[in-house]
Amino acid sequence: MSGAALIPGARYAFGVVHPVAPMLRVRYRQGVPVDPYGFPDWTPYARAVIALPPLPPGIGVDEARVLDVLTANLAVPDPTDPDASGRTPAGWVWAHLARCRRVALVPAELHAALRHLGGVSTGDADPRRRGLPVDTTAPPPLRFTERLAPAVVSRVEQRLGVALPAGYRDFLARTNGGWPAWPAVHPRFGFVVDQPLFGMARADWMQDLCHANASLTDRFTADWLAIGHLQGGLLAVRVAGGDEGSVWYWDDDDPRARDDDTAADVGDRLLHRCADSFGVFWHDLRAVPGSLRDLAAVAMAGGRVTRVEDERTGSALPPARRQPAP
């Protein structure tokens, strides 16, 4: 329809979209193909593509995303997960392929770099049904590998040009970007926390707090600091402009998003406030609902989850990331 608002990525229909950040344009130099409807085809950057069964009737969009992540991780378990907790391999996220029941395991930084739709918001889930039916009362234990010296944290603030809010600053100093011991969810939203959050001096510089934010300037103004990838988007803290220290969620499949949205638009109307502080945010996290775990297990046991064989799978990944899927 003439004058209708375009979905994110629509301008690239029938073409290829490249990340804005120069660092990512070099790493993923072939770009991501876009279908006639403006949805990205992640297959060339996938370590695995999984075909999922139809969604249960009446399931909400938040439940649908969590269910799909759980099911895909049962099909492609992470061999580095000592507890077999069902988490996604670090540095990777599950991306929905549009207009079908398939998900692709793709690099988290590439998925976050491109504004797009094509996920659960365009599927059969009920958009009016939000939130998750959590059935536990305790937050996840925090895992980490190292602490940061106070001088290092001060240098981080100098590089970023902002004073980190106290709650998040303490988390960064104590864990250098820790992660939950098991996949965690927030009762009000449809994301899964199963990745290490951004830290410093990471082996992959796109997991580095400073480098990662340099690639997200089209997403966040200077009032916000991205602090990690989620299955379902990005986590950010507010660092300026009032309400400093609050934690926010950017949904990477938000149907309200438009192709011409700026970083200011994202901050004004596309972020979801999760908590007053990072400590409160972590305390609100819960284990994945047992009802969704059961649905994923039944689908696997019934043979309704299959690995898709496609010669294009992973064909555009950098050589260092083309190892077989875990």
Question: Language-model segments: which ranges?
Answer:
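Short, well-ordered loop/turn elements at secondary-structure boundaries
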Residues: 87-89, 99-101, 220-222, 230-232, ...
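Compact, glycine/acidic-enriched structural inserts
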Residues: 248-288
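Charge-dense, low-complexity intrinsically disordered regions
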Residues: 298-326
